Design a protein with these regions (language model features):
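Short, well-ordered beta-strand segments in beta-rich or mixed alpha/beta enzyme
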Residues: 5-10, 39-69, 104-105
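Short, surface-exposed ligand-recognition loops at beta-strand->loop->(often short) alpha-helix junctions
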Residues: 9-21
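Intrinsically disordered, low-complexity acidic/polar segments
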Residues: 17-19, 61, 97
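An amphipathic, aromatic/His-enriched active-site/gating alpha helix that lines ligand/cofactor pockets
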Residues: 26-39, 55-90
Length: 106
C-alpha cells in the first residue's frame, strides 16, 4: 500500500512558466526509471504555480527519491526557474483510489 508521499509546490519566475512545465515532464521520465517511486503527478495549480505529488510504499523509497536525480536537478535549476525555493512537504497517505492510468496533457 502506498502510505507516504511528498507534496512539492513550485512558483515559477515570471517568463519561466513553460520551462518549469517542461522540467516537470522531464522529471516524470526520470521517475519512470525509479522503482521506489510508483506514483507521481506533475500538476499546474495556476498560471505560474506548479506542484508535484509523489507516493511511496515506505520511508526508504521516499528517501531514495529525495536523494535521487530528480531532486538534485530541481535544486540545481531552482535559482533560474523558481521565484522562491521549492516547498517540500512530507505527507502521510490516509487513503487512495487509483483505478486507471492518467494521461499526460498535450
Amino acid at each position: 500500500m502506498l502510505s507516504l508521499g511528498l507534496f512539492v509546490r513550485l512558483e515559477a519566475r515570471p517568463g519561466k512558466e513553460k520551462d518549469v512545465a517542461a522540467f516537470l515532464m522531464q522529471g516524470l521520465q526520470l521517475a519512470n526509471q525509479e522503482p521506489t517511486t510508483p506514483l507521481l503527478f506533475a500538476l499546474r495549480l495556476g498560471p505560474s504555480t506548479f506542484a508535484v505529488f509523489d507516493a511511496f510504499h515506505d520511508e526508504s523509497g521516499r528517501q531514495t527519491h529525495l536523494d535521487g536525480s530528480i531532486a538534485k536537478a530541481l535544486m540545481a535549476y531552482a535559482p533560474d526557474l523558481l521565484a522562491v525555493p521549492p516547498s517540500i512537504e512530507k505527507t502521510e497517505i490516509l487513503g487512495s483510489k487509483v483505478s486507471q492510468e492518467v494521461r499526460t496533457a498535450a
